[in-house]
């Protein structure tokens, strides 16, 4: 069983339209919302060894290390919201042939840990997967360069690329 987890309905909409039979859950934005959603799914018995959770959404690219519009698989998440002494890294094995990248969950500094992209949910997914024993896959489409003004973000383009990529691996 595959559960597709999206932070927002906006991120899910193109894939939902293209694949209405998919099990799609909207987690809400951020680490706490993602943890609460995964805990609820676990409590309902919907997670486990036979389940894969695919977290999909947009991400920002540090310094253009990944081009806007590109879709990547996150293989390593670094929780950098805490002081550097408490940074925590979570990794998974590749599940696709997409380019694998390192991501920060919530922005701090690219020099701090060499991340290529950032998002707000990924480290939670990987930590919960280790704790609860389900397979985690994170697919992100780059919508912007970190730090650029919101009006320059190319969200529509990124979401179309994300949906097309998810259809290849469903």
What are these regions (language model features)?
Residues 1-3:
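Extreme N-terminal starter segment of soluble prokaryotic enzymes
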């Amino acid at each position: 069983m595959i559960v597709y987890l999206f932070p927002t309905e906006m991120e899910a909409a193109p894939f939902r339209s293209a694949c209405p039979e998919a099990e799609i859950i909207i987690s809400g934005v951020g680490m706490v919302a993602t943890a609460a959603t995964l805990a609820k799914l676990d409590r309902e018995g919907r997670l486990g060894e036979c389940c894969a959770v695919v977290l999909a959404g947009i991400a920002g690219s540090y310094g253009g290390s990944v081009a806007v519009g590109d879709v990547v698989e996150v293989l390593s998440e670094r929780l950098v919201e805490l002081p550097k002494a408490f940074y925590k890294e979570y990794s998974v094995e590749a599940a696709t042939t997409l380019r694998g990248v390192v991501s920060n969950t919530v922005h701090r500094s690219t020099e701090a840990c060499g991340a290529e992209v950032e998002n707000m949910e990924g480290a939670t997914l990987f930590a919960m997967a280790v704790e609860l024993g389900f397979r985690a896959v994170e697919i992100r489409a780059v919508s912007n360069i970190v730090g650029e003004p919101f009006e320059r973000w190319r969200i529509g383009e990124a979401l179309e690329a994300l949906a097309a990529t998810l259809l290849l691996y469903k």
